[in-house]
Amino acid sequence: SGHPVYTNGDGSQGMLHTGMGATGWGAFAANAYNRSSGVGSVALGFHTMAGKPDVDQNGITGDNIGQFSVGWSVRATGNRAFASGHRTVASGSDAVAMGNWSYATGDSTISLGKENWAEGASTVAIGFKNHAAGGGSVALGQENVSWGTTNFTSGYQNVAGDTSAGVGTAGSATAMGYRTVASGRSSMSANKYTNAINQASTSLGLGTTADNFGMLAVGVNNAAGIGDTTIDPDNYGGYYYSDGQYTGSNPGV
Protein backbone atom coordinates (compact mmCIF):
# COMPACT_ATOMS: atom_id res chain seq x y z
CA SER A 1 0.00 0.00 0.00
CA GLY A 2 3.02 2.31 0.39
CA HIS A 3 4.20 1.83 -3.18
CA PRO A 4 4.61 5.19 -5.01
CA VAL A 5 3.16 3.84 -8.28
CA TYR A 6 1.00 0.81 -7.43
CA THR A 7 -2.49 2.14 -6.70
CA ASN A 8 -4.69 -0.90 -6.11
CA GLY A 9 -4.12 -0.65 -2.36
CA ASP A 10 -5.86 -3.95 -1.71
CA GLY A 11 -3.11 -5.50 0.40
CA SER A 12 -2.61 -8.30 -2.12
CA GLN A 13 1.09 -7.60 -2.35
CA GLY A 14 1.80 -8.36 1.31
CA MET A 15 3.79 -11.27 2.72
CA LEU A 16 0.95 -13.02 4.55
CA HIS A 17 0.68 -16.75 3.82
CA THR A 18 -0.40 -20.03 5.40
CA GLY A 19 2.99 -21.42 6.39
CA MET A 20 6.72 -21.48 5.72
CA GLY A 21 8.88 -24.22 4.27
CA ALA A 22 8.75 -26.36 1.14
CA THR A 23 5.02 -27.09 1.15
CA GLY A 24 4.50 -27.75 -2.57
CA TRP A 25 5.02 -30.96 -4.52
CA GLY A 26 8.74 -31.22 -5.37
CA ALA A 27 9.36 -27.76 -3.95
CA PHE A 28 12.63 -26.51 -2.46
CA ALA A 29 13.22 -23.88 0.22
CA ALA A 30 16.53 -22.88 1.77
CA ASN A 31 17.96 -20.23 4.08
CA ALA A 32 15.49 -18.50 6.44
CA TYR A 33 11.71 -17.89 6.63
CA ASN A 34 10.98 -18.86 3.04
CA ARG A 35 7.92 -20.51 1.50
CA SER A 36 7.81 -22.58 -1.69
CA SER A 37 4.25 -23.78 -2.22
CA GLY A 38 4.06 -24.29 -5.99
CA VAL A 39 4.92 -27.48 -7.83
CA GLY A 40 8.70 -27.57 -8.29
CA SER A 41 9.00 -24.05 -6.89
CA VAL A 42 12.17 -22.65 -5.33
CA ALA A 43 12.44 -20.08 -2.53
CA LEU A 44 15.85 -18.78 -1.45
CA GLY A 45 17.15 -15.91 0.64
CA PHE A 46 15.28 -14.34 3.54
CA HIS A 47 11.50 -14.25 3.87
CA THR A 48 10.66 -14.98 0.23
CA MET A 49 7.65 -16.67 -1.34
CA ALA A 50 7.42 -18.91 -4.42
CA GLY A 51 3.90 -20.06 -5.21
CA LYS A 52 0.45 -19.08 -4.09
CA PRO A 53 0.32 -17.73 -0.53
CA ASP A 54 -2.79 -19.66 0.47
CA VAL A 55 -2.34 -22.96 -1.41
CA ASP A 56 0.03 -25.81 -0.58
CA GLN A 57 0.17 -27.63 -3.92
CA ASN A 58 0.35 -31.30 -2.95
CA GLY A 59 -0.27 -32.73 -6.43
CA ILE A 60 1.12 -31.93 -9.86
CA THR A 61 -0.81 -29.18 -11.61
CA GLY A 62 -0.16 -26.72 -14.40
CA ASP A 63 -1.62 -23.61 -12.77
CA ASN A 64 0.65 -23.29 -9.70
CA ILE A 65 4.07 -24.42 -10.84
CA GLY A 66 7.67 -23.41 -11.43
CA GLN A 67 7.95 -20.23 -9.36
CA PHE A 68 11.37 -18.95 -8.28
CA SER A 69 12.12 -16.34 -5.62
CA VAL A 70 15.44 -15.14 -4.25
CA GLY A 71 16.36 -12.12 -2.15
CA TRP A 72 14.59 -10.42 0.73
CA SER A 73 10.81 -10.34 1.05
CA VAL A 74 10.18 -10.99 -2.63
CA ARG A 75 7.08 -12.75 -3.97
CA ALA A 76 6.83 -14.94 -7.05
CA THR A 77 3.17 -15.89 -6.71
CA GLY A 78 2.13 -16.05 -10.35
CA ASN A 79 2.31 -19.23 -12.37
CA ARG A 80 5.93 -19.78 -13.53
CA ALA A 81 6.87 -16.37 -12.11
CA PHE A 82 10.34 -15.10 -11.15
CA ALA A 83 11.14 -12.52 -8.45
CA SER A 84 14.48 -11.34 -7.09
CA GLY A 85 15.90 -8.45 -5.11
CA HIS A 86 13.99 -6.63 -2.36
CA ARG A 87 10.21 -6.40 -2.00
CA THR A 88 9.59 -7.23 -5.64
CA VAL A 89 6.37 -8.89 -6.79
CA ALA A 90 5.79 -11.19 -9.76
CA SER A 91 2.12 -12.04 -9.40
CA GLY A 92 1.18 -12.44 -13.05
CA SER A 93 1.67 -15.68 -14.93
CA ASP A 94 5.13 -15.81 -16.54
CA ALA A 95 5.95 -12.47 -14.88
CA VAL A 96 9.46 -11.28 -14.00
CA ALA A 97 10.24 -8.73 -11.27
CA MET A 98 13.79 -7.75 -10.35
CA GLY A 99 15.27 -4.94 -8.29
CA ASN A 100 13.72 -2.98 -5.44
CA TRP A 101 9.94 -2.68 -4.96
CA SER A 102 9.24 -3.39 -8.63
CA TYR A 103 5.88 -5.03 -9.36
CA ALA A 104 4.97 -7.24 -12.32
CA THR A 105 1.28 -7.96 -11.79
CA GLY A 106 0.10 -8.58 -15.35
CA ASP A 107 0.61 -11.81 -17.26
CA SER A 108 3.88 -12.07 -19.21
CA THR A 109 5.18 -8.79 -17.77
CA ILE A 110 8.66 -7.51 -16.92
CA SER A 111 9.43 -5.00 -14.18
CA LEU A 112 13.09 -4.10 -13.61
CA GLY A 113 14.68 -1.45 -11.41
CA LYS A 114 13.14 0.47 -8.53
CA GLU A 115 9.47 1.10 -7.76
CA ASN A 116 8.16 0.26 -11.21
CA TRP A 117 4.79 -1.31 -12.04
CA ALA A 118 4.11 -3.47 -15.08
CA GLU A 119 0.34 -3.67 -14.80
CA GLY A 120 -1.24 -4.67 -18.11
CA ALA A 121 -0.61 -7.97 -19.85
CA SER A 122 2.67 -8.17 -21.80
CA THR A 123 3.91 -4.83 -20.45
CA VAL A 124 7.47 -3.73 -19.66
CA ALA A 125 8.54 -1.19 -17.03
CA ILE A 126 12.26 -0.54 -16.63
CA GLY A 127 14.00 2.16 -14.60
CA PHE A 128 12.58 4.18 -11.70
CA LYS A 129 8.92 4.76 -10.86
CA ASN A 130 7.62 3.85 -14.30
CA HIS A 131 4.07 2.59 -14.87
CA ALA A 132 3.20 0.46 -17.88
CA ALA A 133 -0.57 0.24 -17.52
CA GLY A 134 -2.20 -0.57 -20.85
CA GLY A 135 -1.72 -4.00 -22.37
CA GLY A 136 1.41 -4.32 -24.49
CA SER A 137 2.80 -0.96 -23.35
CA VAL A 138 6.40 -0.07 -22.49
CA ALA A 139 7.75 2.53 -20.03
CA LEU A 140 11.49 3.19 -19.87
CA GLY A 141 13.45 5.73 -17.86
CA GLN A 142 12.09 7.61 -14.85
CA GLU A 143 8.55 8.48 -13.79
CA ASN A 144 6.97 7.71 -17.14
CA VAL A 145 3.40 6.51 -17.66
CA SER A 146 2.25 4.36 -20.58
CA TRP A 147 -1.49 4.43 -19.96
CA GLY A 148 -3.09 3.27 -23.19
CA THR A 149 -2.71 -0.06 -24.93
CA THR A 150 0.56 -0.55 -26.83
CA ASN A 151 1.86 2.83 -25.67
CA PHE A 152 5.57 3.68 -25.47
CA THR A 153 7.34 6.17 -23.21
CA SER A 154 11.02 6.85 -22.65
CA GLY A 155 12.92 9.57 -20.85
CA TYR A 156 11.75 11.54 -17.82
CA GLN A 157 8.17 12.28 -16.72
CA ASN A 158 6.46 11.57 -20.03
CA VAL A 159 2.86 10.40 -20.46
CA ALA A 160 1.38 8.37 -23.30
CA GLY A 161 -2.36 7.76 -23.27
CA ASP A 162 -5.33 9.59 -21.78
CA THR A 163 -4.94 9.31 -18.01
CA SER A 164 -8.26 11.10 -17.45
CA ALA A 165 -10.03 8.01 -18.81
CA GLY A 166 -9.77 4.32 -18.02
CA VAL A 167 -6.62 2.27 -18.44
CA GLY A 168 -6.07 1.44 -22.10
CA THR A 169 -7.48 4.70 -23.50
CA ALA A 170 -5.64 6.41 -26.38
CA GLY A 171 -3.66 3.42 -27.57
CA SER A 172 -0.59 3.28 -29.80
CA ALA A 173 0.68 6.64 -28.54
CA THR A 174 4.36 7.51 -28.08
CA ALA A 175 5.92 10.08 -25.72
CA MET A 176 9.67 10.62 -25.48
CA GLY A 177 12.00 13.17 -23.94
CA TYR A 178 11.16 15.40 -20.98
CA ARG A 179 7.61 16.07 -19.77
CA THR A 180 5.96 15.33 -23.08
CA VAL A 181 2.34 14.21 -23.46
CA ALA A 182 0.79 12.07 -26.19
CA SER A 183 -2.84 11.70 -25.14
CA GLY A 184 -4.50 11.14 -28.51
CA ARG A 185 -4.79 7.72 -30.06
CA SER A 186 -1.80 7.00 -32.35
CA SER A 187 -0.27 10.37 -31.39
CA MET A 188 3.40 11.17 -30.85
CA SER A 189 5.25 13.77 -28.80
CA ALA A 190 9.00 14.17 -28.42
CA ASN A 191 11.70 16.49 -27.10
CA LYS A 192 10.57 18.87 -24.29
CA TYR A 193 7.19 20.11 -23.02
CA THR A 194 5.42 19.02 -26.21
CA ASN A 195 1.76 17.97 -26.35
CA ALA A 196 0.08 15.79 -28.97
CA ILE A 197 -3.47 15.71 -27.67
CA ASN A 198 -5.61 14.62 -30.58
CA GLN A 199 -5.95 11.69 -32.91
CA ALA A 200 -2.81 10.86 -34.95
CA SER A 201 -1.22 14.22 -34.08
CA THR A 202 2.52 14.88 -33.71
CA SER A 203 4.27 17.48 -31.57
CA LEU A 204 8.04 18.03 -31.72
CA GLY A 205 10.47 20.62 -30.41
CA LEU A 206 10.00 22.85 -27.35
CA GLY A 207 6.59 23.65 -25.92
CA THR A 208 4.65 22.86 -29.08
CA THR A 209 1.03 21.67 -29.17
CA ALA A 210 -0.74 19.59 -31.83
CA ASP A 211 -4.42 19.44 -30.88
CA ASN A 212 -6.11 18.85 -34.24
CA PHE A 213 -6.68 15.55 -35.99
CA GLY A 214 -3.53 14.37 -37.80
CA MET A 215 -1.75 17.70 -37.36
CA LEU A 216 1.97 18.38 -36.91
CA ALA A 217 3.50 21.04 -34.64
CA VAL A 218 7.25 21.63 -34.88
CA GLY A 219 9.61 24.25 -33.47
CA VAL A 220 9.34 26.45 -30.40
CA ASN A 221 6.01 27.25 -28.76
CA ASN A 222 4.09 26.61 -31.97
CA ALA A 223 0.59 25.20 -32.14
CA ALA A 224 -1.19 23.36 -34.93
CA GLY A 225 -4.98 23.36 -35.12
CA ILE A 226 -5.83 25.30 -31.98
CA GLY A 227 -9.46 24.52 -31.32
CA ASP A 228 -11.75 22.53 -29.08
CA THR A 229 -9.30 20.68 -26.86
CA THR A 230 -12.13 19.03 -24.94
CA ILE A 231 -13.02 16.81 -27.89
CA ASP A 232 -12.59 13.11 -27.17
CA PRO A 233 -9.05 12.26 -28.32
CA ASP A 234 -9.97 8.59 -28.54
CA ASN A 235 -12.79 9.14 -31.05
CA TYR A 236 -12.08 8.83 -34.74
CA GLY A 237 -14.75 11.39 -35.65
CA GLY A 238 -12.19 14.17 -35.53
CA TYR A 239 -12.60 17.83 -36.49
CA TYR A 240 -10.96 20.27 -38.90
CA TYR A 241 -10.39 24.01 -39.20
CA SER A 242 -10.09 26.01 -42.40
CA ASP A 243 -8.90 29.63 -42.24
CA GLY A 244 -9.49 29.60 -38.52
CA GLN A 245 -13.09 28.40 -38.79
CA TYR A 246 -14.43 25.09 -37.51
CA THR A 247 -15.76 23.01 -40.43
CA GLY A 248 -17.00 19.90 -38.63
CA SER A 249 -15.66 17.81 -41.48
CA ASN A 250 -14.47 14.27 -41.04
CA PRO A 251 -10.82 13.47 -41.74
CA GLY A 252 -10.03 13.45 -45.45
CA VAL A 253 -12.86 15.84 -46.40
Please describe what each predicted stretch is.
Residues S1-V253:
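Periodic small-residue-enriched repeat registers in elongated scaffold domains
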